Amino acid sequence: MSQLVQFIDGQWLAGAGKPFESKDPAKNQVIWQGEAASAAQVEAAVKAARHAFYHWSDLALDYRLAIVRRYADLLGEHKEALALTIARETGKPLWETRTEVAAMQGKIAISIRAHDERTGTVENPMPGAKAFVRHKPHGVVAVFGPYNFPGHLPNGHIVPALIAGNTVVFKPSELTPMVAEAMLKIWQEAGLPKGVLNLVQGEVDTGKALAGNPDIDGLFFTGSSRTGHFLHQQFAGQPGKILALEMGGNNPLIVKDVSDIDGAVHAIVQSAFITSGQRCTCSRRLFVERSVQGDALVKRLVEVVGQIKVGLYDAAEQPFMGAMISEKAALGMVEAQANLQRLGGESLLTLTHLEAGTGFVSPGIIDVTAVSALPDEEYFGPLLQLIRYDDFDAAIDQGNATSFGLSAGLLGDSEADWQHFFKRIRAGIVNWNKPITGASSAAPFGGIGASGNHRASAYYAADYCAYPVASVEDSKAAMPDQLSPGLTF
């Protein structure tokens, strides 16, 4: 394994900080080792980005776009190798990591279109002059990436930031350093000038050094609510720096009067258990009516979820669920389930840690209807809380009884119920009769409350990657036709 794991000012360097490693959570094997970037190396990365900023932002947009498009082409050339790297480091099945790489490619054209539509140049009519609205890059921005989509989600910040003319210092999750290294090598192959994109690998100390660097102009973060809140506090009193936070959710999914039970169950499974429940949009709470139909749906759901195939990412017969990101994460889900049981929850399908040393768990469903003080927690794994209800409005109110507000959904045949639900539910992603995990890069992605800070990403990422500049212009200074009162020339 190479120890040259930091990419600073166009050079691969060994880290000068503490050693750390990455494990394949499905096979319990160390697959990456390196030393973290020291505070001095983080400072060097920021300085390199600052030095490269004017050169990069002064380049014609078409030149920047040519490099970004070349990156998209190279993603296609390296798609299978990159998909395998993501699978090895996250435990996700290959069928899913292949879709992640495809989403990374698709993000390029979407980001170019969003940049043009949302942050392009507009000329407004004005007598005696020209009026323009243009957009400028912020400068040096830090990007913090998560582990669940270690390619696609940081890509969703990095690509629009570079298109806009920013330079970037990227701090990936310490759980997925191998994916980050592979991404940077593809960018390097695409011909990105030195200093434009820098990689600082490491754990908490590296992240703190980057977030606290006084010379960054902004920080774009996707990850846990806990870390996002820490960053928000760290940036307090710095209104000149832009902070874009995309965090988690305690997402409600309500079922009411469905005619196709299997169709509803499929949407629930896709909402709660895809990616082993490790999507920020995954449903954490399922509301089902107390009725004969509701009983039938719950029974069918338990049957289907109990048959979900869990297995190795590279198995010939692909599983629906792979391993969670780590054994620690898997054991955390076991403990979360135990805590809900202590509070009065009844497991309908018990989540079980399947193999010591790995992130493999079976999916779980727990009825928490009887729990009077349900914790407002994002259980980031395949554990679905079931709540039975009698009144639709009360279910919506309970769905809104969370500090989060990322995603929500209704499964039901009545359009009137859908319209009512849409008006009342508080979330940034609200779906009807579709899984709540299928967000599109061609739409804004973000939430309210503890799920974000009103800086929606995906298609709206262009908005936080550049700031608007209004200009009134004429070719020369000239006397007006009429002077203001009190002036003599």
Swiss-Prot record:
Pathway listed for it is: Amino-acid degradation; L-arginine degradation via AST pathway; L-glutamate and succinate from L-arginine: step 4/5
Where, by residue number, is the active site? E246, C280
**What Gene3D superfamilies does the record tag this protein with?**
Aldehyde Dehydrogenase, Chain A, domain 1, Aldehyde Dehydrogenase, Chain A, domain 2
An annotated Gene Ontology molecular function: succinylglutamate-semialdehyde dehydrogenase activity
Keywords of the record: Arginine metabolism, NAD, Oxidoreductase
The GO annotation for biological process reads:
arginine catabolic process to glutamate; arginine catabolic process to succinate
Taxonomy, superkingdom? Bacteria
Quote the record's binding site residues for NAD(+). G223, S224, S225, R226, T227, G228
Give the EC number(s) listed in the UniProt record: 1.2.1.71
**Could you tell me what reaction this enzyme catalyses?**
N-succinyl-L-glutamate 5-semialdehyde + NAD(+) + H2O = N-succinyl-L-glutamate + NADH + 2 H(+)
Q: Name one Pfam family in it.
A: Aldedh
User: NCBIfam families in the record, alphabetically?
Assistant: arg_catab_astD, PRK09457.1
Output the PANTHER family linked to this UniProt entry: ALDEHYDE DEHYDROGENASE-RELATED
Q: What HAMAP family does the record point to?
A: Aldedh_AstD (MF_01174)
Q: Record's family?
A: Belongs to the aldehyde dehydrogenase family. AstD subfamily.
Q: What is the annotated role of this protein in its UniProt record?
A: Catalyzes the NAD-dependent reduction of succinylglutamate semialdehyde into succinylglutamate.
Please state what the protein is called: N-succinylglutamate 5-semialdehyde dehydrogenase
Q: What is the lineage of its organism?
A: Bacteria, Pseudomonadati, Pseudomonadota, Gammaproteobacteria, Aeromonadales
